[in-house]
Amino acid sequence: MMRVLVVEDNALLRHHLKVQLQDSGHQVDAAEDAREADYYLNEHLPDIAIVDLGLPDEDGLSLIRRWRSSDVSLPVLVLTAREGWQDKVEVLSSGADDYVTKPFHIEEVMARMQALMRRNSGLASQVINIPPFQVDLSRRELSVNEEVIKLTAFEYTIMETLIRNNGKVVSKDSLMLQLYPDAELRESHTIDVLMGRLRKKIQAQYPHDVITTVRGQGYLFELR
């Protein structure tokens, strides 16, 4: 399963991509413009982005260049109607990793996504290490003092997000969106229950409270 960011201004195509990707088991954030794409990029930490070039507020190539200049390293797959070789060179030169020309079959998009993730897995670290905490991204495991802590899928998602944002407050709404993409399933007290369980499991291996509730803002992971 991947978290996919789809950036497409055409509402029908955006919805089609989102549904097809979700049906394949992926989590999907769908943005209609560059501003919304920036929000999802920073809040939800996607594994890969699918970007259309014709966005209403910023050209797709400009968006990709801006991401790359800010050291955003996630794989980017471009959707384009431009078929000339010069256009394809420009797409790849912008910092995109691959492209699909319109019209396309969703199977081709899926195949290119998987290829990019395989290629990227050899380049990016699969472990986040903040001693004595360690997150194995490929195994989806949290270890403390080299002991694996058994977490549910929701608990792991919360811990990975907090540790990725070490020292930064993560909003409650952001966590809720990651756990429950469907708004009808969200209940704010669920996060509080999960946090309580997480703290107990962690304190069995590490005596200090590393998850702080920041009133009115969210949650903070920080070693003391």
UniProtKB/Swiss-Prot annotation:
The modification 4-aspartylphosphate is found at residue 52. The keyword Zinc does not apply. It is found in: Cytoplasm. Its main location: cytoplasm. Phosphorylated and dephosphorylated by PhoQ. Keywords: Activator, Cytoplasm, DNA-binding, Growth regulation, Phosphoprotein, Repressor, Transcription, Transcription regulation, Two-component regulatory system, Virulence. It holds the Pfam family Trans_reg_C. Induction: The phoP/phoQ operon is positively autoregulated by both PhoP and PhoQ in a Mg(2+)-dependent manner. Repressed by RcsB via sigma factor RpoS. Induced by acidic pH and by low magnesium. GO terms for cellular component: cytosol; protein-DNA complex. Disruption phenotype: Decreases survival in macrophages. Decreases tolerance to acid stress. Abnormal expression of genes encoding virulence proteins. Decreases fitness in the spleen and liver of mouse. 10,000-fold reduction in virulence in male BALB/c mice (for strain ATCC 14028). Double knockout with phoQ decreases virulence in mouse. InterPro entries: CheY-like_superfamily, OmpR/PhoB-type_DNA-bd, Sig_transdc_resp-reg_receiver, WalR-like, WH-like_DNA-bd_sf. One of its GO terms (biological process) is regulation of DNA-templated transcription. It comes from the Bacteria. Transmembrane segments: none annotated. Monomer in the inactive, unphosphorylated state and dimer in the active, phosphorylated state. Member of the two-component regulatory system PhoP/PhoQ which regulates the expression of genes involved in virulence, adaptation to acidic and low Mg(2+) environments and resistance to host defense antimicrobial peptides. Essential for intramacrophage survival of S.typhimurium. In low periplasmic Mg(2+), PhoQ phosphorylates PhoP, resulting in the expression of PhoP-activated genes (PAG) and repression of PhoP-repressed genes (PRG). In high periplasmic Mg(2+), PhoQ dephosphorylates phospho-PhoP, resulting in the repression of PAG and may lead to expression of some PRG. PANTHER family: REGULATOR OF RPOS, TRANSCRIPTIONAL REGULATORY PROTEIN PHOP. PhoP/PhoQ-signaling cascade, which activates virulence membrane proteins (PagC, PagO, PagD, PagK, PgtE and PhoN), is induced by cationic antimicrobial peptides (CAMP) (polymyxin, alpha-helical peptide C18G and sheet peptide protegrin-1) at sublethal concentrations. This is Virulence transcriptional regulatory protein PhoP. It comes from Salmonella typhimurium (strain LT2 / SGSC1412 / ATCC 700720).
